[in-house]
Amino acid sequence: MKNRSAIKRHNQSEVRRMRNRSAKSEVRTTARKYTEAVHAANAENAAALLRELSSQLDSAARKGILTKNSAARKKSRMQLLYNASFAAK
């Protein structure tokens, strides 16, 4: 088999793709739950989800799934949404 290393690299990339896809899906799901909690004016749940989302984004950035700036931008926007909804009240 001449292309054994190519087959191995392909298999490795598939494993990485599935792992990255799962992590990105987790982040998107938490972000959706967070925005729903903010729009429902549930401050306690939103605060807990914001902490969880921030942790997931940092983890994804550390693993190279998202870039550092992308994770920081998403965290900033979620914090702005939280502050606009609950800080004035």
Curated annotation (Swiss-Prot):
Keywords: Ribonucleoprotein, Ribosomal protein, RNA-binding, rRNA-binding. Residues 11-30 have a biased composition (Basic and acidic residues). GO terms for cellular component: small ribosomal subunit. GO terms for biological process: translation. GO terms for molecular function: small ribosomal subunit rRNA binding; structural constituent of ribosome. Residues 1-30 are annotated as: Disordered. Coiled coil: none annotated. Binds directly to 16S ribosomal RNA. Belongs to the bacterial ribosomal protein bS20 family. This is Small ribosomal subunit protein bS20. It comes from Treponema denticola (strain ATCC 35405 / DSM 14222 / CIP 103919 / JCM 8153 / KCTC 15104). The lineage of its organism: Bacteria, Pseudomonadati, Spirochaetota, Spirochaetia, Spirochaetales. The gene is rpsT.
